[in-house]
Regions:
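Alpha-helical transmembrane segments and their helix-start/interface "positive-inside/aromatic belt" motifs
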Residues: 1-11, 83-99, 195-206
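Binding/recognition "hotspot" determinant
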Residues: 1-60
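Non-cytosolic segments of integral membrane proteins
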Residues: 4, 8, 94-182, 212, ...
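Membrane-helix interfacial "entry" motifs
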Residues: 39-51, 75-88, 138, 142, ...
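Hydrophobic transmembrane alpha-helix segments characteristic of membrane transport
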Residues: 60-96, 177-192
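Short alpha-helical basic/polar micro-motif
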Residues: 67, 87, 163, 167, ...
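Alpha-helical transmembrane segments
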Residues: 183-200, 262-269
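Surface-exposed substrate-engagement region within the catalytic domains
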Residues: 204-209, 213-214
Length: 269
């Protein structure tokens, strides 16, 4: 039986190390700007994708300009007024300015949200989950539940990893296709909503890392004694530290995955 004990006892420690490593790595990458997240991917977006969609957007801007005129003016002889013409021209100017400023605006949003999230994380004194000191009885209990803890740690770590990295990929796509969305401004009601939708999505995806950082800090402050009497936990032989760490990991993974939904429901963006 000794080989079983020696084989299962490190599983709890392995789960703790996997979770802390993946969470620290994901937070470090998630709080960085897309430019520093992957310089090669950002170079592809900045040098190829963005100019490509910008060229298409310049053509689409002219098309939506004529569509906007046709939609706002039913009878050119009777309905074409100076006010209508000025309104459409202002939209064209804004669209042209926006097409050439999408990258600057995106970089500004990325830097603001990344800096804010980093400040929140540094001031929150986040350290990850702790293994704690185990006596002989607790070590035996942790040996039994070590497999379950390791599985929970791997699943939660994978959820956080996929969520944060998919968010970063979406930020690259948002910066690239931004000119197409902005070119819809002169299209009139309905079509011009694409520009607003792009801005809302950019803000949601960018600000979600701030919500994630705050949520992780809040969850790390939880303790089982907040929900159960301390005497009850000390009198019953329970792997309290293991249960608390599993609770923190599952709640953190759920919060990271639901950050976008929280932003949409709370701020309507």
């Amino acid at each position: 039986m000794e080989w079983i004990t020696n084989g299962l006892s490190p599983l709890y420690t392995l789960g703790v190390n996997i979770w802390n490593l993946i969470l620290s790595f994901c937070l470090g990458k998630g709080l960085s700007t897309p430019e520093s997240f992957s310089p090669s991917a950002w170079a592809y977006v900045n040098n190829f994708l963005y100019p490509f969609f910008q060229a298409i957007a310049a053509t689409m801007l002219n098309l939506f300009f004529y569509i906007g005129i046709c939609r706002q003016v039913g009878n050119l002889r009777e309905s074409m007024t100076l006010e209508t013409g000025v309104n459409i021209l202002i939209k064209v100017i804004l669209g042209n300015l926006g097409i050439n400023s999408v990258m600057l605006f995106s970089k500004w949003v990325f830097e603001i949200t990344g800096t804010t999230g980093s400040v929140m994380l540094s001031t929150g004194e986040f350290k990850g989950i702790e293994q704690g000191v185990l006596d002989s009885v607790q070590a035996m209990v942790h040996m039994i539940v070590g497999i379950i803890f390791l599985v929970v740690a791997i699943v939660c770590s994978a959820t956080v990893f996929i969520t944060i990295f998919s968010r970063s990929v979406q930020l690259y796509m948002l910066a690239a296709v931004g000119p197409l969305a902005i070119s819809c401004i002169p299209g009139g009601p309905g079509i011009q909503n694409a520009a607003g939708a792009w801005i809302k999505t950019l803000l949601t995806k960018s600000l979600s890392i701030v919500i994630i950082a705050i949520f992780i800090i809040l969850v790390s402050k939880f303790d089982l004694t907040d929900f159960f009497a301390e005497n009850l936990l000390t009198d019953i032989v329970l792997p309290t530290r293991c249960i608390q760490n599993m609770f923190i990991m599952m709640l953190t993974a759920a919060g990271v995955k639901g950050a976008d939904l929280f932003m949409k429901q709370t701020f309507g963006i």
